[in-house]
């Protein structure tokens, strides 16, 4: 079962919850606001599917690609406003625009009304505004992998941008390659504490006697 994984090794991808056939895995917030899995032993049938999809436990099997050598490119969006609204050059916006033009679904992290972060996917080109730019906070992906799999099985094209652990988790969850799926990940050191983040938002709102209405993390 997934509880064999030491807490400090858990990457917080949430994929074990989507994979559990009995809904025995839920997630709780620790004292820093990070989400961790919890197993209801009454529902668990010890099938170990949660272990089989875990990107940390199966990291060696997931370290594969089709390139003899890595191919490296540098890119920046031509539109200055897009670069300003993005975090690191606007490349995602270019990929997303192309995907939307082909009627594809685009997924990634978005801000919620309370400035928490969750995973989101749609084929609405207007959603690019909330999908672009980095968030730097742990994202709630509960239910997301199942949604992506359903869209892929329906034959729809999907472009998905996420952290390396999220992309590895998705590929492990899908169990096979899909020709209609393109994934984008990025170099990621860690995600910040959601609880500290919310404390920071509260600090700003108290300091300026106003609600936060817009966020840009380019200089944070």
Regions from the language model: what does each represent?
Residues 1-8, 109-113:
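Small-residue-rich anion-binding loops in enzyme active sites
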Residues 2-3, 9, 15-32, 36-38, ...:
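Iron-sulfur cluster-binding cysteine motifs and their immediate structural context
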Residues 12, 46, 159-160:
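Conserved SAM-binding loop
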Residues 42-43:
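Short, charged amphipathic alpha-helical surface segments
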Residues 58-218:
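Iron-sulfur-associated redox domains of electron-transfer enzymes in respiratory
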């Amino acid at each position: 079962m997934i509880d064999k994984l030491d807490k400090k090794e858990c990457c917080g991808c949430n994929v074990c919850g989507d994979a559990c056939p009995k809904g025995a895995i839920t997630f709780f917030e620790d004292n820093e606001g990070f989400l961790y899995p919890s197993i209801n032993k009454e529902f668990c049938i010890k099938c170990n599917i949660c272990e089989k999809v875990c990107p940390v436990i199966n990291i060696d099997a997931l370290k594969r690609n089709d390139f003899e050598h890595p191919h490296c490119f540098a890119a920046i969006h031509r539109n200055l406003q897009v670069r300003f609204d993005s975090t690191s050059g606007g490349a995602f916006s270019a990929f997303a625009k192309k995907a939307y033009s082909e009627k594809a679904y685009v997924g990634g992290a978005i801000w919620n009304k309370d400035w928490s972060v969750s995973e989101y996917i749609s084929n609405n080109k207007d959603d690019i505004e909330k999908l672009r730019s980095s968030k730097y906070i742990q994202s709630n992906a509960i239910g997301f992998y199942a949604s992506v799999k359903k869209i892929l099985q329906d034959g729809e094209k999907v472009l998905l941008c996420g952290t390396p652990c999220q992309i590895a988790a998705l590929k492990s969850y899908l169990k096979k390659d899909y020709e209609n799926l393109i994934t984008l990940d990025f170099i990621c050191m860690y995600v910040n504490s959601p609880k500290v983040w919310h404390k920071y938002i509260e600090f700003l709102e108290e300091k300026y006697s106003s609600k936060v209405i817009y966020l840009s993390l380019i200089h944070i």
